[in-house]
Amino acid sequence: LEFQTEDGKTFMDGSAVAQAKAATITNDTGNKENIVELTLTDEGAKTFAEVTSANVGKALPIVYDDEVISYPTVQQAITGGTAQISGMANYEEAESLASQIRIGSLSLKLEEMRSEVVGAQLGEEAISSSLKAAAIGLVIVMIFMIVQYLVPGVVAAFALAIYTTLVIATLYLFEITLTLPGIAGIILSIGMAVDANVIIFARIREEIADGKSVATAIETGFARARSAILDGNITTLIAAAVLGLRGSGTVKGFASTLAIGIILSMFTCMVVTKVLMHAVYAIGVRDAKFYGKAKERKPFDFVGKTGIFIAISCAIIVCGCVGVGMHKSSDGTILNYSLEFKGGTSTAVVMDKQYSIKEIDKEIVPLVEKITGDGNVQAQAVEGTKQIIIKTRTLSLEERTKLEKTMTKNFGVDKKDITSESISSTVSNEMKTDAIVAVVIATICMLLYIWFRFKDVRFAGSAVIALSHDVIMVFICYVLAWISVGNTFIACMLTIIGYSINNTIVIFDRIRDALKKHHAQTKAAYKEIVNKSIAQTMSRSVNTSITTFVMVLVLYIMGVTSIREFALPLMVGLLAGTYSSICLASEIWYLLRTKGMKKE
């Protein structure tokens, strides 16, 4: 807050104001008038007396945050340390001005809680490589769909093109900033969008195999696939919603694009794909051979091999836990917490050559320690690149600027190749708490939805066990691969939870349909239903996993380091989720459902 003369010179700041309040008085003419009463400090009163004495009849603008908030004219010299500003239209206007003056008079010191500075070249390269990955992955998925599903595959390719266009248009319409996690959300949603088409086409093939006409098969296939599509997408949408409400800025970017992708994928598969399928049929493509026919699969005894599946999972988890223990004994910690969860400053620098760890410790670390006064500087090289990552305590803006200048001067680094991120310990603790709450809330909501939809707590119970299996697998991946654990860790976990539940729901949906038709009374009957349901959905489970995995794999190959750290555990989670949905979830439901039941 500044008090200025007409020529723009500041003669007094907000510290000279002791009090400012709105009031309504009766003036000399007997009319009520709304004013602001100013009470000045002793030093302020002295300065104000001198300036007003020399500026009678002139204006003394009051400026707050570079904006003139009042333009009062001096009627007479003010020497008593109090002043009145008149001319307000109503009391609310007077109160607003008084409030601004009070706020401006406070002695506030801003403390930087979080900052992120990205070099222009790094940002452009990251966005460019991620978008290329999305385009390549999309083309691969389209080719796979055409080869696998013939005419419906061509329809799916067109629907995917329309879907992608709608996503881009929506992002542009709502002016959603495209971040790297946001692009990851788009790429993942493209892979998951294929799932709905795969479910529909599998149902259509089954209807044709049952002897129905193509026209009837198309209509019935869409109708029978609807419940599985809605249930699977709603559970993933729940995860996206929780991420959007509880996550930080970068995670919200991932959540928003994922949510948009899910909503638009449901629209394109249930409306666009259906219209295109009917259009293809209408122009004369009516022979069943163009649509494919479901092959009769001899059900594999998945239920009978439950013990083997559980033993395999337990063996992997035990080996992983041993690796975790060895990792802790050598490094002293289990997880590689990123800045979001522990606070500090991370500076990424693209050097003019690849540096070894010894060179970094000898040439770079001592300089950073000297600048920052931090004796615990951590620096590492990004494998296969010229980039190094320097982690320190939280640095001030001045310290970051000094570090930047030093790197530019001593190593010839271009300023645009330096990226820095700072997070205070306060923010990191809040983010860690929000992350835990987000996972718990999302998981509970998804499981409650399953319970509500399937009217059987055993479905939810078996889903919990399968999800725990997937989460443990991904956790082990983070530990052994020493991947940074931050907000993308939460995004990855919730994505895997949503994906795994989606896979599991498709099989549960088949079991539910079978239970409506066949009133099973024995273990053998339930065993047959479960084995047949898994066999019927096997092609869908495998094909969906392949398309989603391909999208993430391309992202891993072409993405920058931060994206790779998201894609790698995501691929592990996709494999674990596919395995658990096929080999564990339904089998565990069978064990819970038939507990205490006679074999025959």
Where in this protein do the model-derived segments appear?
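Interfacial segments of transmembrane alpha-helices in multi-pass membrane proteins
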Residues: 36-37, 41-62, 123-124, 128-179, ...
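Non-transmembrane, solvent-exposed regions of membrane trafficking/translocation machinery
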Residues: 1-74, 83, 97, 450
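Small-residue-enriched core segments of transmembrane alpha-helices in multipass membrane transport
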Residues: 153-175, 186-193, 254-269, 460-481, ...
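Transmembrane helices with small-residue packing motifs
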Residues: 296-353
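Juxtamembrane "pre-transmembrane" interface segments
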Residues: 80-84, 92-140, 395-443
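Pore- and gate-forming transmembrane helices of large, multi-pass membrane proteins
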Residues: 121-141, 192, 210-248, 301-302, ...
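Hydrophobic alpha-helical transmembrane segments of membrane transport and translocation systems
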Residues: 206-317, 558-600
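Cytosolic juxtamembrane regions of multi-pass inner-membrane proteins
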Residues: 191-232, 278-285, 483-544, 590-600
